[in-house]
């Protein structure tokens, strides 16, 4: 019997400004820095990944939108240049990504068996979205861990929120089943911002941090309320408040990655570790981790079940 398991889950936001601020060699635009609090938060998350030693990273991004079904990348390797459609001045990134096609196919099949519409993406010239790329780079800049990339079907936007997030719950449970059968140790990445109200004019230069602050008072207050509940492990309350949070803070978790991740982890009522919080063009971004190894719910790397 396979002994796959989920070893940790992260809220891992994807503002391209973080890549721009870091100046990796893959990104053509160069900066003088900026958004340090969030970049330092990702440094702490990277240290956790290094300690966990996962076999695979699974990422759900709201910017790979598929209106019909949930799609999974089914190509071994993709390479090319990604240009952010909103911030081409900040993000022109040369990517090279290896995918775990076997696990992607298993997730696709488990989703189909659970009643979802699922599909494998086999186009060898497909260009991954900037959200997927940003999250993956910020969490593991070595790019040495295979990836399962999952699209956003966006059902919470065109069905009722309850129906849409219910479908994401099913997707999460199907993902878990595939991981358990795979024998692999997996980390889940919910590529989401929290409050998503944002500025409409960019400062010059973009990394002028004297211009960076929360766009709305209510958005910031909601972020702090939800983060504090997460830090206390009061996850039942988080999910009870989630619809109101989404409506009042325009929270990007509406796209479903947060629900998908927690459904896959069986909704653990565990205190989260906040690696850091900061705003990007006014939006609220938190790097948050639920480490199932530290909680005794998953094995340490190298230990038998």
From Swiss-Prot:
Activity regulation, per record: Strongly inhibited by CuSO(4), FeCl(3), K(3)[Fe(CN)(6)], AgNO3, HgCl(2) and MnCl(2).
Function description: Component of the 2-aminophenol 1,6-dioxygenase complex that catalyzes the ring fission of 2-aminophenol to produce 2-aminomuconic 6-semialdehyde. AmnB seems to be the catalytic subunit of the complex. The enzyme is also active toward 2-amino-p-cresol, 6-amino-m-cresol, 2-amino-m-cresol, 2-amino-4,5-dimethylphenol, 2-amino-4-chlorophenol, and catechol.
Species lineage: Bacteria, Pseudomonadati, Pseudomonadota, Gammaproteobacteria, Pseudomonadales
GO-annotated biological processes: catabolic process
Protein name: 2-aminophenol 1,6-dioxygenase beta subunit
Gene name of the encoded protein: amnB
UniProt superkingdom: Bacteria
Keyword Iron: yes
GO molecular function per UniProt: ferrous iron binding; oxidoreductase activity, acting on single donors with incorporation of molecular oxygen, incorporation of two atoms of oxygen
Cofactor annotation comment: Binds 1 Fe(2+) ion per subunit.
Entry cofactors: Fe(2+)
Family recorded in the similarity comment: Belongs to the LigB/MhpB extradiol dioxygenase family.
Subunit structure: Heterotetramer of 2 alpha and 2 beta subunits.
């Amino acid at each position: 019997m396979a002994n796959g398991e989920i070893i940790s889950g992260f809220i891992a936001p994807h503002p391209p400004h973080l890549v721009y601020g870091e100046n990796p060699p893959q990104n053509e635009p160069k900066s003088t820095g900026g958004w340090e609090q969030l970049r330092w938060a990702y440094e702490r998350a990277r240290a956790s990944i290094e300690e966990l030693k996962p076999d695979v990273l699974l990422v759900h991004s709201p910017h790979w939108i598929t209106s019909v079904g949930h799609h999974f990348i089914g190509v071994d390797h993709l390479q090319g240049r990604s240009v952010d459609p909103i911030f081409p001045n900040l993000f022109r990134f040369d990517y090279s990504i290896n995918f775990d096609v076997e696990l992607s196919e298993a997730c696709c099949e488990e989703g189909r068996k659970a009643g979802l519409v699922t599909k494998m993406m086999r186009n060898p010239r497909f260009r991954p979205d900037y959200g997927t790329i940003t999250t993956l780079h910020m969490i593991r800049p070595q790019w040495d861990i295979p990836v399962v990339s999952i699209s956003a079907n966006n059902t919470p936007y065109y069905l009722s929120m309850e129906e849409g997030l219910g479908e994401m719950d099913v997707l999460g449970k199907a993902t878990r089943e595939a991981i358990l059968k795979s024998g692999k140790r997996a980390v889940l990445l919910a590529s989401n911002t929290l409050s998503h109200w944002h500025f409409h004019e960019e400062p010059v230069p973009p990394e002028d941090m004297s211009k960076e602050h929360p766009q709305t008072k209510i958005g910031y207050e909601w972020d702090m309320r939800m983060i504090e509940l997460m830090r206390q492990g009061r996850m039942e309350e988080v999910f009870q408040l989630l619809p109101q949070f989404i409506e009042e803070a325009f929270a990007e978790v509406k796209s479903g990655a947060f629900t998908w991740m927690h459904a896959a982890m069986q909704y653990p009522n565990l205190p989260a570790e906040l690696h850091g919080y900061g705003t990007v063009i006014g939006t609220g971004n938190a790097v948050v981790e639920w480490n199932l190894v530290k909680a005794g719910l998953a094995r340490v790397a190298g230990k038998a079940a």
